């Protein structure tokens, strides 16, 4: 392995007083991150040479988890994020999501409000999964297709961080970064394909800057896989499909959906085609997300219904041309929800 050619590692400043690092080594600083609106203004004054972004904490999930939960939580996120939008930061840093579905919903809420660049913090646990059981590769597959331009990984254990990066690196098509204790760099932690470093809240950028500059040994590069197959997610696990992937017959999203999904578990189709005919079907889909273990092809005659289904489905949906949609609508669904047109 060889050093990453794009960057020797850049740092995000999190304190206006660290602006002297810019004068010392401008190429080391990739941006400035403020934790509130007052700090954002200070960052703009002290660090005008780099983009200044704003940290946005994801709100807690409601105690009532009954469906429809996804759209309710998106509305909660929009209300929490709306005061930030008028300040027009260069980017937002989403963090603190309770699980992957909450993080995805927060991304949708932010892209509803703003076209600014998005960084998303992704906490990883053991065995390449998040605490809620979501495969980190499945999470990255979704985030990089719905508007997130940089994914920042965090972990309680250094080995969990390295393991997650090894899994993600060949398939990530966005910038990868880490937010970890500076001492991990001192111990030469392996950080494949990492280009960005964000200081922990209790640590100053100055110490991290010295380590990024002087201890590059763990920053190796894992070559990207060739895109001869598509990486998709069912909302929990990652799958690889090609354009000849078998898709089931249409499965109505009615009160028997869970039974039908169980019956199909032993059958051949690699993807389930779910039929959305009315708004109640969207609720049924959300109720049964935990039952879905394969890629999903969503079909609906109405683009409005299709969009509602895309908002609640936590994976990357396929579209096979059933009930032809306008090109402009498909383009929007692809950019907003990561829809994959077969």
Predicted regions located by residue number:
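Domain-level signal for soluble alpha/beta catalytic cores
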Residues: 1-342
């Amino acid at each position: 392995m060889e050093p990453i050619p794009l960057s020797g590692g850049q740092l995000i400043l999190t304190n206006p007083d660290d602006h002297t690092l810019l004068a010392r080594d401008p190429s080391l600083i990739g941006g400035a991150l403020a934790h509130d609106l007052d700090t954002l203004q200070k960052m703009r004054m002290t660090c005008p040479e780099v983009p200044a972004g704003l940290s946005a904490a994801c709100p807690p999930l409601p105690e009532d988890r009954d469906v429809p939960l996804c759209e309710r939580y998106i509305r909660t996120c929009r209300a929490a994020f709306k005061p930030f939008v008028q300040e027009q930061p260069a980017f937002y840093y989403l963090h603190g999501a309770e699980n992957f579905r909450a993080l995805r919903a927060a991304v949708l809420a932010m892209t509803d409000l703003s076209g600014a660049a998005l960084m998303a913090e992704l906490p990883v646990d053991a065995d390449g999964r998040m605490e809620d059981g979501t495969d980190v590769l499945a999470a990255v597959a979704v985030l990089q297709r719905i508007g997130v331009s940089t994914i920042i990984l965090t972990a309680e254990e250094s080995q969990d961080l390295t393991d997650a990066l090894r899994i993600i690196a060949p398939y990530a098509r966005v910038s990868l970064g880490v937010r970890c204790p500076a001492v991990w760099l001192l111990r030469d932690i392996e950080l494949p394909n990492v280009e960005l470093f964000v200081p922990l809240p209790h640590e100053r950028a100055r110490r991290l800057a010295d380590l990024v500059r002087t201890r590059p040994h763990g920053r190796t590069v894992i070559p990207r896989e060739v895109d001869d197959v598509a990486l998709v997610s069912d909302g929990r696990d990652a799958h690889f499909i090609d354009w000849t992937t078998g898709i089931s017959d249409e499965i109505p999203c009615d009160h028997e959906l869970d039974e039908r999904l169980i019956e199909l578990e032993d059958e051949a189709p690699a993807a389930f085609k779910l039929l959305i005919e009315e708004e109640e079907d969207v609720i049924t889909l959300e109720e049964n997300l935990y039952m879905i273990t394969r890629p999903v092809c969503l079909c609906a005659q109405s683009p409005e219904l299709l969009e509602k289904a895309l908002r609640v489905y936590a994976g990357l949906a396929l579209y096979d041309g059933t009930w032809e949609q306008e090109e402009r609508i498909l383009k929007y669904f692809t950019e907003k929800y990561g829809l994959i047109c077969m």
